[in-house]
From Swiss-Prot:
The function of this complete protein has not been studied, but it may be similar to the function of the disintegrin domain. A recombinant protein of this domain (409-484) inhibits collagen-induced human platelet aggregation, without having effect on ADP-induced aggregation. It may act either by blocking the binding of fibrinogen to the platelet receptor GPIIb/GPIIIa (ITGA2B/ITGB3) or by blocking the binding of collagen to the integrin alpha-2/beta-1 complex (ITGA2/ITGB1). It comes from Trimeresurus albolabris. This is Zinc metalloproteinase homolog-disintegrin albolatin. Residues 21-191 form a propeptide. PANTHER family: ADAM A DISINTEGRIN AND METALLOPROTEASE DOMAIN (PTHR11905), DISINTEGRIN AND METALLOPROTEINASE DOMAIN-CONTAINING PROTEIN 28 (PTHR11905:SF32). Its main location: secreted. The disintegrin belongs to the dimeric disintegrin subfamily. InterPro entries: Disintegrin_CS, Disintegrin_dom, Disintegrin_dom_sf, MetalloPept_cat_dom_sf, Peptidase_M12B, Peptidase_M12B_N, Reprolysin_adamalysin. Expressed by the venom gland. GO terms for biological process: proteolysis. Residues 1-20 form the signal peptide. The lineage of its organism: Eukaryota, Metazoa, Chordata, Craniata, Vertebrata. Belongs to the venom metalloproteinase (M12B) family. P-II subfamily. P-IIb sub-subfamily.
Length: 484
């Protein structure tokens, strides 16, 4: 394992709190001004990286000291990530930029087990973190020769439209004859990890809205993808950005006021064009179009591995990439086959990702209903999940491994997160090695840190699909993948 570089940022609160200001996130009614002072504890003679693998921030929120830990999201990009745009004569231009030293991070607040964070450190600190159940945003103030940042609650951002926005997918309300299990009862870490290799496309209206600035558009896409990884981590789904495409000279599929027509045309373009030149699992269209009937997005249901229907469309909100990410997470949920939440569904927040009415305050949580449906039904459907098993191998991840980030990487036996959060007795959170006497730490064929006996059914058949059985040599349940 590498030595994790610890960087301390002291954020000193400015002598006043602002009452109102226009920021990139919108018009903010109440905010704190802080000045990040970076103090780096590097060994003498060591070379500082441009973007460290791990950082620590110490600052105050409402006078309360907090510690924010950040780790680079090393699973943000797939190994063969590409970017495509078009010349004035319509010629496709595709490049394969180096993305190893990127500036997008996940994190958490110390001593707050419920906290999450998604931060860009490209030009100052920009993103959001959750503290004591409240969502806070941080972003740099655009002042000359100043390191000032604003910190504010999401609820203090003036909303663009107080009217409820709707998801365009209908007839997908959650129903089940099975009792709803609490999240803690699902034992979700034992599910096999899957990977959605995702392409994001920015349409021509979005291109003109950003004044043709392809770099800014790409940065927004990276922020959205970074947020998606946070949302899908509880399901053990990695969302890997495998490509971006910007329709710089005009739309390549029909984009109209009708979300249904736009979705259908986009799916046809994917099957006809994109799939023939770029291997991927799902593609999402970011559009500047404001659809009829206050629809914020549209996606096909139970369509993840379908050549035409594994698509979604989402309206772009220029100032709020975290809001766009929330709505894209909702659409991806439908692609996987997850239904809208019913009245009995809960996630411990005001709204959940699969709520039919899109809240102005985004949620980064799936409800107990969504997690139950995923663990009890969706993972057994080969037609909506088979394409998600070809996750890039551990050796394909180009950045160094970090113990404690929940992802199994080269040199690790297990990774149950930071020591303060790890609840797996089979895994030593400080070394990411198995504890003495343990054979495994997770998997459908792992019980009490030991391999389950050979021949034990680990995945019960659904319909004509055969049972899968443990081998007695691994904690993983082999996917046989055939009908009997």
């Amino acid at each position: 394992m590498i030595q994790v570089l610890l960087v301390t940022i002291c954020l000193a609160v400015f002598p006043y709190q602002g009452s109102s200001i226009i920021l990139e996130s919108g018009n903010v009614n109440d905010y704190e001004v802080v000045y990040p002072e970076k103090v780096t504890a590097l060994p003498k003679g060591a070379v500082q990286q441009k973007y460290e693998d791990a950082m620590q921030y110490e600052f105050k929120v409402n006078g309360e000291p907090v510690v924010l830990y950040l780790e680079k999201n090393k699973e943000l990009f797939s190994e063969n990530y590409s970017e495509t745009h078009y010349s004035l004569d319509g010629r496709e231009i595709t490049t394969y930029p180096s993305v190893e030293d990127h500036c997008y991070y996940h994190g958490r607040i110390q001593n707050d087990a419920d906290s999450t964070a998604s931060i860009s450190a490209c030009n100052g600190l920009k993103g959001h973190f959750k503290l004591r159940g409240k969502t806070y945003l941080i972003e740099p103030l655009k002042l000359p020769n100043s390191e000032a940042h604003a910190v504010f609650k999401y609820e203090n951002v003036e909303k663009e439209d107080e009217a409820p926005q709707m998801c365009g997918v209908t007839e997908t309300n959650w129903e089940s004859d099975l009792p709803i299990k609490k999240t803690s009862q699902l034992n979700l870490p034992l599910l096999e990890k899957r990977c959605i290799e995702l392409v994001m496309v920015a349409d021509h209206r979005m291109y003109t809205k950003y004044d043709g600035d392809k770099t800014e558009i790409s940065s927004k896409i990276y922020e959205i993808a970074n947020n998606l990884n946070v949302d899908y981590r509880p399901m053990k789904i990695r969302v890997a950005l495998i490509g971006t495409e910007i329709w710089s000279t005009g739309n390549l599929s029909k984009v109209t006021l009708s979300a249904d027509e736009t979705l259908d045309s986009f799916g046809e373009w994917r099957e006809r064009d994109l799939l023939k030149r770029k291997s991927h699992d799902n593609v999402q269209l970011l559009t500047g179009m404001i659809f009829n009937e206050k629809i914020e997005g549209r996606a096909y249901n139970k369509s993840m591995c379908d050549p035409k229907r594994s698509v979604g469309i989402v309206r772009d909100h220029r100032t709020r990439p975290h809001l766009v990410a929330n709505r894209m997470a909702h659409g991806l949920g439908h692609n996987l086959g997850i239904h809208h939440d019913g009245d009995s569904c809960s996630c411990g927040a005001n709204s959940c990702i699969m709520s039919a009415t899109v809240s102005n305050e985004p949620s980064s949580r799936f409800s107990d209903c969504s997690l139950n449906q995923y663990s009890n039904d969706i993972i057994y459907n080969p037609w909506t999940s088979y394409c998600l098993y070809n996750e890039p191998s551990k050796t394909d991840i180009v950045s160094p491994p970090v113990c404690g980030n929940y992802y199994l990487e080269v040199g690790e036996d297990c990774d149950c997160g930071p020591p303060a959060n790890c609840q797996n007795p089979c895994c030593d959170a400080t070394t990411c090695k198995l504890t003495p006497g343990s054979q495994c730490a997770e998997g459908l064929c792992c019980a009490q840190c030991k391999f389950i006996e050979e021949g034990t059914v680990c995945r019960v058949a659904k319909g004509d699909w055969n049972d899968d059985h443990c081998t007695g040599q691994s904690g993983d349940c082999p996917w046989i993948g055939y009908y009997g």
